[in-house]
Amino acid sequence: MDITLHTTNLKQFRTSLYQNFNNRADTLIDLLDAMCSVPNAKSVVEYSLASCYQRSYSTIFKAIDELTLAELWLPHRVGPYLPKPEKWPFWLLIADVTTSPRPYAHTLEDRGMVYQPEVVKGKLPVTIGHQYSTVALGLEPEPGVSCSWVLPLQSERVATTEDKEMVGCRQIERLMQETKLPFGQDLTVEVGDSSYSKPAYLHAHRKFPNLVTIARVRGNRKFYYPYVPTQEKTKKRSQGRPRQYGERFSLPDPATWTEPNETHTLWETSRRGKVYRVEIQAWHNLLMSGKNKPERLPMHKYPFTLVRIVRYDEEGNEAFKHPLWLIVMGERRHELTLEHIYQAYLCRFDIEHFFRFGKQNLLLVDFQTPEVKREENWWQLVHIAYAQLWMARHVAEALPRPWERNLPAMKQRLNSPTLVQRDFARIIRQLGTPAQPPKPRGNSPGRRQGMKLPKRPRQMVVVKGKKATQVA
């Protein structure tokens, strides 16, 4: 591995960040370095205590407040360093939504009911806060690098008046329409969970011939075979609209299934050494029912491939209670093998590692501000910091703690985001920073004596499906 090449790329990437920050570029570079090198900060203001942060703590909030980035700012910065897929014949985009709980921010605007997992069984997994949609690039495994990496490209807050899946749809459309990025010209696969299998989302992306959508579907869905008219009905002239759907294909009813058009068997070994047999079945050219409201969605024009995946243990028993159902929709879906489809959907879970790392190590949801714009800017900064850690993945050295030295992952020396963050302070000391040293200008006069700021107004909590709103 040529360490000089990776070091040069990291320097160029940091210089590009510095040159494209419109306001307070020196402060933002120092803040990003502090975020990437301090894994145990408890609050955002603690980043001012890092050795690489040369300024006072108040400049952190001024820089966050004045941050202005374009919609495709981060994709343009990482575009020259995107690793072209070699094992896969496609680019992989992962879309998902995560929550930012803010139940006690009574003056924060546009809060709604969002999902939050609960440890205690029986409690409603609901809290008050915001939702953010993230689109990341799925990456192929690299030697010496952990497979949990993704490359975040876009982050956008989901307003209470918007559909979270359609926000992700809009983000992917920007990536597909940008000519400076390779996604619109090459075969691109997007993956999502069951909420992304709705007709509105699938229909919106059919205008891109190079885009293939892989989405999980619930086990109670119902699809249809294409309608094939008989000879008698062909001779008989009928009035009205021609029939579009054939026999029913009900996922919970195996009696409605036909023989699959394609099958494939894989063997997998877990981390604990258990061997599993994966059976993949596919039915081609199925149809789903469309919608008439709020707009007409003629889904009968877009056939798809239905995939059923079942995993068996060494004794032949099903490893999971329910099978995994996937739909594959797009003009170029036939270029994907069943193994490609299976591997692409497995990579969807890598974005969960990014959310977990961001919340635990980068304070993704810990910036307590009453301003929506500042919260959105902070989310953008966390995505940029994670991208900088990804750029340093080949430069960092694995630094396990004393009780971690004998772990299998440490013996393999696979650089994960956590290990790169531990070593990032050393990297910065060796490479230096493009930021200029601060120029103290003395103490500010501050507010005049006797000045009192008005109280912030309390905001309503948006509860969908009800006429009245709830007071926080």
Regions found by a protein language model. Name each.
Residues M1-E66, L72:
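Gly/serine-rich nucleotide phosphate-binding loop at the start of the catalytic core
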Residues M1-L17, F21-R24, N40, H106, ...:
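Single, function-defining residue in the core of a domain
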Residues D30-A34, A136, V382-Y386:
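Contiguous, well-ordered alpha-helical segments that form the cores/surfaces of helical PPI scaffolds
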Residues A34, A50, P80-Y81, R174-T179:
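A generic secondary-structure signal
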Residues S37, A50, W88, K121-P125, ...:
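Short gly/ser-rich anion-binding loops that grip negatively charged ligand groups
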Residues S51, I64, D96-T99, L139, ...:
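Short, flexible loop/turn elements at secondary-structure junctions
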Residues T59-K62, W73-K84, M166-R174, L187:
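Hydrophobic, well-ordered secondary-structure segments
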Residues I64-S146, P152-L153, N292:
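Active-site-proximal, Lys/Arg-enriched surface segment
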